[in-house]
Amino acid sequence: MEAAGARNRDARSRAEKSPPESRKVYMDYNATTPLEPEVIEAMTEAMREAWGNPSSSYPAGRKAKEIINTARENLAKMIGGQPQDVIFTSGGTESNNLVIQSVVKHFHKVHAANGDTGGHPNPVDGALPHIITCTVEHDSIRLPLEHLREERVAEVTFVPVSKVNGQVEAEDILAAVRPATCLVTIMLANNETGVIMPVPEISRRVRALNQQRVAGGLPGVLVHTDAAQALGKQRVDVRDLGVDFLTIVGHKFYGPRIGALYVRGLGEHTPLYPMLFGGGQERNFRPGTENTPMIAGLGKAAELVAENGEAYEAHMRGVRDYLEERLAAEFGERIHLNSQFPGAERLPNTCNFSIRGPQLQGRAVLAQCRTLLASVGAACHSDLGDRPSPVLLSCGVPVDVARNAIRLSVGRSSTRAEVDLVVQDLKQAVARLEGQA
């Protein structure tokens, strides 16, 4: 963490020395993160020294293959899995789509193979594969599922989250299971509220249910979690989570914009089918010549998380908590913390809040800010205009409060000095807006 400490000091020094009109403070780390210097170095070295095709036997190719293998090992270590269960993808969207498409294809394949039941009724005969998710998922889960439903390729149940704690309840997931259910996909942590979902409990309940289903001739239910927002901010271990699939997104933990997918017992215990066809790379599950420099960067980012994760988490939690203290001190009862729910844990870096007032819509406040760089919510929902976030509404946040929402997410180099600048910037932005009324 010495390098991180140096970066913190550098950031603090910049914040203190820069003239007020030129100071910019980035607090949108849930949207994306900058590359760590070590990541840039790993990528640059790969471009310079490992330019060969990883499938080739000459030195530059062997070097590329070695880098890819090391990166796979680092990713596995970060999540407590096995290297052979990790494949590289272009990013979280591809990983999520790959899971969904694979499970649907597997359902049809197994159902066709088991079509002849010797005159006995097949409990899923004629049924479409059924997938369960929740109402606050990322678009890379929600939209593929809506598309499958519109095309009548699958049936989908969107389970609402609790308006008390912002979580999806395991009991509600189990209640939605049907004979043709083949997948439950629930994000590990929400990108807008930071609320951590009870994925371990859901996995445990589904495993117990699967024992009964198999005995009754029903297909087993697989469990997937999109861990994009959790990785690099809290401990993530697939053994504790008990999932069959886990999505990894590099640019959320200071890595490059590629991703990976963990598949428990890839190809043996858990099915996976390629969406692309070509060469034999990634054991035919994801063909195409590997992007060695990006993979090198992803592996280095994972290595840093495995080595420094606890320190990263503690630092971000301290800065985030200080941010919420300062907001409360400055705005008093006008502040509504949209990401604090009783009985629910949340990411250590995320603060979603609203400043009450008829002129203080989140976008309007941010537009008046001269220092703060942030967003009102998920980057993929940037086209909502002044409409309140569907995620916050699903969590029970009132419409007038949700419309004023701002999401601040701190990072590894965020400082208390930057928090002070941001709160002062928000105070001045609010004063300007209310002065215009």
UniProtKB/Swiss-Prot annotation:
A Pfam family this chain is assigned to: Aminotran_5
Catalytic activity from the UniProt record: L-selenocysteine + AH2 = hydrogenselenide + L-alanine + A + H(+)
Subunit structure: Homodimer.
Keyword Phosphoprotein assigned: no
Top-rank taxon, per record: Eukaryota
Active site residues of this protein: C380
Gene Ontology CC: one annotated term: cytosol
Modified residues (N-acetylmethionine): M1
Bias kind Basic and acidic residues: ranges: 7-26
Gene: SCLY
UniProt EC number: 4.4.1.16
PANTHER family reported in the protein's UniProt record: CYSTEINE DESULFURYLASE FAMILY MEMBER, SELENOCYSTEINE LYASE
Annotated keywords: Acetylation, Cytoplasm, Lyase, Pyridoxal phosphate, Transferase
InterPro entries, alphabetized: Aminotrans_V_dom, Cysteine_dSase, PyrdxlP-dep_Trfase, PyrdxlP-dep_Trfase_major, PyrdxlP-dep_Trfase_small
Lineage: Eukaryota, Metazoa, Chordata, Craniata, Vertebrata
Protein's name in the database: Selenocysteine lyase
Reported function: Catalyzes the decomposition of L-selenocysteine to L-alanine and elemental selenium.
